[in-house]
Amino acid sequence: VDVVRSITELRAILAPDAARLAARRRTEANAERLIHAAAAMAEAALDLDELSERANYFWKQLILSSGNLAYRLAFNSLQTAYLDHAPQFRKLIAPELQAASAYQGISQAVVDGDADLAKRRTQELVAVGDTIIMSAIEAYTSQQGGE
């Protein structure tokens, strides 16, 4: 439970600010990779395994596009922890993974250099999964008699 909560909390902080920085530090190469990654989300249909892999690639491109080395290191830790718990996460965050238009909206905001919009759209997308995960944690800890 602590690992899942920690992953969720870090993701909620890291992803939106990385999107903001990616928009501010936008390069043609980074923009192209991000647009491609977002488009790939729409092509994956409803296969959660494939969507999860493509989402992971999208977030990696976003983090790399931020140009922040500390964010990259944090993402690597986050990614390792996520992959260790991927089957559980996939099912919980299916609505987030299936929100292809949200990924495209984030990438477009980055391409347009709109840092505030990129941050806001990322917060909105991540909140979809975070709300589900935190509710599941709360339900689990209630069943267990607290933390």
Identify what each model region corresponds to.
Residues R5-T8, A12, K119, Q123:
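Short amphipathic alpha-helical segments with heptad-repeat character
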Residues T8-E9, Y57, Y103, Q108:
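Generic hydrophobic-segment detector
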Residues I35-E43, S77-E147:
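C-terminal all-alpha effector/ligand-binding and dimerization domain
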Residues V1, L10-A29, A39, E53-I93, ...:
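Hydrophobic, amphipathic alpha-helical faces that serve as interaction scaffolds
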Residues A31, L51, L117-K119:
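Solenoid-repeat scaffolds in large eukaryotic assemblies
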